[in-house]
């Protein structure tokens, strides 16, 4: 099975050469993490490991800092293949890096209690389903910060550039609630290149991206309506081109990107503050 995000040079969505100084990027991120931790007087990092490519890359680079790294596996009604990939990745890092330790915190009972307490019928209309799905992400954020504070560790984000700044494919105050974001300036395609350089397990490199927030399998592409390479292309032309400048799938993708990008601004802009006129304060 080919990697789902591989994009060929004949693709209409090709934006530039896929070559990258992967080793230099890895060293740069590791150094950035070390320097930030030192400035923050933190002992290291806590990372939620899902079995996906982003968390695998972040945790593998964090391991190379030499600082304490706590990897949390936090299943909530998780699919067996996601659990096995996460556990395999944690074991591999623990075997190589003495500064890495893993921990499993099964949040399914807590989540089930919450769902029962708020009386959500999970077959009800989509808004309730989405709210409950986002509750999974927020429960994991709470857990990461608990162990982060307990151990003097920075909660380390795993969002990529497309998710964090392109289409807002993250949960506000969920996986978007972090102290630092080491790979948020990298596209998904670039992260796959780094994963190959880091020798991330093939099972993770070949897994179809999913956010893991649903009982049924919902891929990222199905939820967003476009693949990561398509959205990377859209991000590169957004602001200089309009959907009407293109035809067919390119036009459709840029329309999707434009809609998602506009809708996600509340996730990245500062919290609005009601400014009181100066004369009212005298």
What are these regions (language model features)?
Residues 52:
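Conserved G/P- and acidic residue-centered "switch" motifs that form tight phosphate/ATP-binding loops
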Residues 2-45, 60-70, 77-80, 88-135, ...:
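ATP/NTP-dependent adenylation/nucleotidyl-transfer catalytic domains that generate, transfer
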Residues 138:
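Catalytic-core regions of hydrolytic enzymes
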Residues 55:
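Catalytic nucleophile loop
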């Amino acid at each position: 099975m080919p990697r789902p995000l591989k994009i060929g040079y004949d693709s209409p969505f090709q934006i530039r050469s896929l070559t990258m100084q992967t080793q230099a990027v890895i060293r740069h991120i590791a150094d950035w993490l070390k320097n930030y931790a030192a400035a923050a007087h933190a002992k290291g990092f806590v990372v939620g490991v899902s079995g996906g490519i982003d968390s695998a890359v972040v945790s593998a680079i964090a391991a190379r800092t030499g600082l304490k790294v706590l990897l949390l596996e936090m299943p909530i009604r998780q699919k067996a293949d996601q659990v096995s990939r996460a556990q395999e990745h944690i074991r591999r890092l623990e075997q190589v890096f003495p500064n890495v330790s893993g921990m499993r915190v099964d949040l399914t009972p807590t989540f089930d209690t919450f769902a029962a307490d708020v009386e959500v019928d999970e077959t009800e209309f989509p808004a309730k389903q989405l709210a409950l799905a986002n509750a999974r992400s927020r429960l994991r954020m709470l857990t990461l910060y608990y162990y982060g504070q307990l151990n003097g560790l920075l909660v380390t984000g795993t969002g990529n550039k497309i998710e964090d700044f392109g289409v807002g494919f993250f949960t506000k105050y969920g996986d978007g609630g972090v102290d630092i974001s080491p790979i948020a300036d990298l596209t998904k395609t670039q992260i796959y290149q780094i994963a190959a350089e880091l020798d991330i397990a093939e099972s993770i490199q070949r897994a179809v991206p999913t956010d893991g927030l649903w009982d049924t399998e919902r891929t990222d592409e199905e939820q967003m309506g476009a693949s990561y390479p398509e959205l990377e292309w859209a991000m590169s032309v957004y602001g200089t081109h309009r959907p009407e400048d293109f035809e067919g799938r390119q036009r459709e993708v840029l329309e999707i990107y434009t809609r998602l990008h506009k809708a996600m601004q509340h996730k990245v802009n500062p919290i609005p503050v009601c400014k009181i006129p100066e004369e009212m304060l005298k």
